[in-house]
Amino acid sequence: MSDRFFLDTNIFVYALSRSVPAKRLTAGRLVDEAIESGKGIVSFQVVQEFFSVAFRRFTPPMSPAEAEQALALTFRPLLAVHSSYSLYGQALELTRSNSISWYDSLIVAAAMESDCRILYSEDLQHGQKLDNLRIQNPFL
């Protein structure tokens, strides 16, 4: 992959849990590529959503020690977008102009703000293009 790309929360849920083995391999490869290439990006929101799921829905729930390891080894190298006035403004515009939910618009705005060309997610419409950003579902 030559361009920067953004990973949505569900990629990490599949990569770091045992819940859906069929998606774990694909998600794990994307996370590995993101870290190894230095071209993968996540936002504060992805980290927050991931840990919310990991602590409440993983079976068994992720332990604090596992969370510390995931934060240091997986998320720290990728975390590049934090909340800002401009991020919220762009997300509001995306919600208004594209009928995207608020939380999804924050993800899209974060990907755009970090100049990503691809947003990997299964929650948005595969193939949709928003400016220079293309949505891609890696599980299709």
Language-model-derived ranges and their functions:
Residues 15, 33-37, 53-57, 74-78, ...:
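Alpha-helix C-capping/helix-to-loop hinge sites
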